[in-house]
């Protein structure tokens, strides 16, 4: 079993005056996401990879109240399963690791530098609309909207254009967060250029090369989801023929 090093040995990993340090960025991002309505009721999560360390927001902490000392740190790479084998090198004694951990690891194993999980209402709504209109295997698709240009075509392939069709895969929710890992990885394998996966009736996972890219992609997607819901109300198709 991997040795679990408790927090009082490695507090230095989350102590920094640098505002760009992951232990400072994660609480700041969580406060923003809370204010935007993305992570209410302690839901959602954020994780950042810096070199061979992964910094992860804990489970059960109100996002607007999160502090650097609440952050978990993992050695990377690390096993996803079983949880007891994960290489924690900084583990707050009074908190639980995020249930999103194996899903974040799936993104990091594919080269991401940051992964964001939100419970955005707009993300949830578009998964329901797609299910109603296209069935359980449908994708979220939208075209001819300026904000699509904020989403990458794929790693190293530049950004989507105005006339391109954005396609985001949707997976089914499960009773426990960690049980989403297999279907998330399958969606990643089948859609290697995607930077996001929607979870029906739940939310979305978005990842990027770094914090700025993951954040701006998440913002662009949420804008597009809200716009899509409003377009649907007006009878305007998401994909222009």
Swiss-Prot record:
One of its GO terms (molecular function) is methylthioribulose 1-phosphate dehydratase activity. GO terms for cellular component: cytoplasm. Residues 1-17 have a biased composition (Polar residues). Binds 1 zinc ion per subunit. The keyword Iron-sulfur does not apply. It is an enzyme of class 4 (lyase). Its EC number is 4.2.1.109. It catalyses: 5-(methylsulfanyl)-D-ribulose 1-phosphate = 5-methylsulfanyl-2,3-dioxopentyl phosphate + H2O. The keyword RNA-binding does not apply. Zn(2+) binds at residues 117, 119, 202. It comes from the Eukaryota. Gene3D superfamilies: Class II aldolase/adducin N-terminal domain. Catalyzes the dehydration of methylthioribulose-1-phosphate (MTRu-1-P) into 2,3-diketo-5-methylthiopentyl-1-phosphate (DK-MTP-1-P). HAMAP family: Salvage_MtnB_euk. This is Methylthioribulose-1-phosphate dehydratase. It comes from Aspergillus oryzae (strain ATCC 42149 / RIB 40) (Yellow koji mold). The gene is mde1.
């Amino acid at each position: 079993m991997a040795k679990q090093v408790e927090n009082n040995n490695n507090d230095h990993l989350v102590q920094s005056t640098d505002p760009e340090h992951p232990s400072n960025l994660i609480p700041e991002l969580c406060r923003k996401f809370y204010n935007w309505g993305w992570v209410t009721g302690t839901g959602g999560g954020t994780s950042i990879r810096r070199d061979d360390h992964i910094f992860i927001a804990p489970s059960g902490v109100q996002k607007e109240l999160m502090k650097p000392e609440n952050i978990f740190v993992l050695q990377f790479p690390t096993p996803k399963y079983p949880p007891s084998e994960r290489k924690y090198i900084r583990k707050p004694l009074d908190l639980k690791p995020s249930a999103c951990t194996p899903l974040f690891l799936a993104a990091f194993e594919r080269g991401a530098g940051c992964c964001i999980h939100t419970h955005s209402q707009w993300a949830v709504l578009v998964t329901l609309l797609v299910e109603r209109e296209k069935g359980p295997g449908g994708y979220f698709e939208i075209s001819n909207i300026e904000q699509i240009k904020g989403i990458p075509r794929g790693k190293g392939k530049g950004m989507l254009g105005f006339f391109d069709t954005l396609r985001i895969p949707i997976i089914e929710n499960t009773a426990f967060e960690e049980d989403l890992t297999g279907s998330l990885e399958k969606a990643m394998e089948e859609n290697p250029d995607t930077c996001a996966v929607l979870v029906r009736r739940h939310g979305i996972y978005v990842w990027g090369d770094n914090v700025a890219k993951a954040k701006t992609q998440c913002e662009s997607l949420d804008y597009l989801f809200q716009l899509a819901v409003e377009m649907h109300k007006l009878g305007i198709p998401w994909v222009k023929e």
